[in-house]
């Protein structure tokens, strides 16, 4: 009986997720009409929060300073690094790159704290004096982020609409050719962007990522809490998710740009990848505190999607019981077969789980092939079948993240660069 209950519950969750994914896929195929206002000359400010990033920072700064955009600057926020991060920033183009060095004990308190310090520094330094906050666009870029050359030209038209507070670009893995694990991470971000983020443009619930998020300074200012100087970013382990939800609650529109992307380094070690995802998972658990704000301030359609998104940690933990419940059911059926003297296992034991688990793989393969023409449709679909198993990484990360939260561990688990 217990095995049947577990199996039935897991199947119900998978069916619900399948219906949701199908809806998002269909919505993502729709075209959204862009509302435009008068073109404005804007200042673009790129923020890079860095903690021991000497291995990757130089290439990222070189790409930013080479952008064919007229009015921009980059601020490297050195969060008390022990390596040559600050030296790399100093060696970059002094006309375009500025350095803020934070020191202990105020440093190393999370990415959100570092970004808030960066915004305060920009204000105090006078670099944004004379600019209307509506015409200053702040972009958060990871130290390993490599922005497409045309990213500013692709993003800028979104901000012609005065109601747009933020725009997220796509995310790719620049080392996706270095093995299967890197390729699957690239597929993961393409699927998330081209299906779920695109669908959320129609729903009104586009989320922000920690890399390649462009935000209007006026929108960030609207998140300020009277009497506090902390800044727009929270201390959540997923400060990007938190910020995106609060922007929507403030009445701003978040957009997703499919015409440009930021490429980052894929994690090539399974243990490091699970460690990274455990931090993201823990941050999602922390975001449960946003539920009252969503219920109170977000329009119904967007609120339903955001609540489903925030419930994903619980769904992941419950779904992780499916392999166990399936084994229990198989064992029970095998015992029953012995007792009955005939096999009770039918072809549906194979067909049913395949349909439940792998139907989405065909949509994922179709979408990924549009980004990676060199793979071909058949290879993309085969890869998407492997991608389904890759998703099991979230099961390990989920239980690890839950354990860290229950034991009170809130430190920033930084992903090591290679």
Whereabouts are the PLM-identified features?
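Membrane-embedded multi-pass helical conduit in multi-pass membrane proteins
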Residues: 38, 309-407
């Amino acid at each position: 009986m217990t095995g049947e209950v577990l199996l039935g519950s897991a199947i119900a969750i998978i069916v619900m997720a399948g219906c949701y994914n199908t809806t998002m896929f269909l919505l993502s195929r729709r075209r959204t009409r862009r509302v435009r206002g008068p073109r404005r000359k804007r200042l673009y400010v790129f923020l890079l929060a860095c903690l021991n990033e000497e291995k990757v920072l130089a290439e990222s700064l070189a790409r930013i300073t080479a952008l064919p955009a007229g009015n921009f600057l980059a601020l490297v926020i050195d969060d008390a690094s022990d390596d040559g991060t600050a030296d790399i920033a100093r060696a970059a183009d002094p006309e375009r790159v500025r350095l803020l060095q934070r020191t202990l004990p105020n440093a190393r308190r999370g990415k959100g704290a570092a970004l808030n310090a960066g915004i305060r520094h920009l204000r105090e330094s006078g670099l944004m004096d004379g600019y209307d906050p509506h015409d200053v666009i702040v972009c958060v870029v990871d130290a390993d982020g490599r922005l497409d050359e045309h990213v500013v030209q692709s993003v800028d038209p979104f901000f012609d609409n005065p109601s747009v507070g933020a725009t997220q670009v796509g995310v790719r893995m620049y080392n996706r050719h270095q093995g299967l694990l890197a390729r699957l991470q690239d597929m993961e971000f393409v699927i998330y962007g081209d299906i779920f983020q695109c669908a959320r443009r129609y729903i009104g619930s586009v989320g922000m990522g920690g890399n390649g998020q462009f935000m209007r300074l006026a929108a960030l200012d609207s998140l300020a809490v009277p009497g506090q100087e902390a800044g727009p970013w929270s201390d959540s382990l997923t400060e990007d998710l938190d910020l995106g939800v609060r922007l929507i609650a403030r009445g701003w529109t978040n957009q997703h740009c499919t015409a440009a992307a930021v490429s980052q380094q894929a994690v090539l070690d399974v243990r490091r990848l699970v460690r990274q995802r455990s931090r993201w998972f823990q941050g999602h658990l922390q975001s449960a505190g946003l539920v009252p704000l969503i219920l109170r301030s977000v329009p119904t359609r967007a609120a339903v999607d955001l609540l489903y998104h925030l419930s994903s940690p619980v769904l992941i933990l419950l779904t992780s019981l499916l392999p166990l419940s399936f084994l229990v059911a198989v064992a029970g059926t095998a015992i029953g077969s012995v007792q009955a003297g005939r096999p009770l296992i039918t072809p549906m034991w194979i067909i049913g789980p395949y349909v439940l688990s792998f139907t989405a793989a065909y949509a994922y393969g179709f979408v990924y092939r549009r980004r990676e023409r060199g793979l071909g449709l058949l290879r993309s679909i085969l890869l998407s079948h492997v991608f389904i198993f890759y998703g099991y990484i979230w099961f390990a990360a989920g239980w690890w993240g839950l354990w860290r939260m229950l034991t009170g561990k809130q430190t920033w688990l930084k992903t090591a660069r290679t």
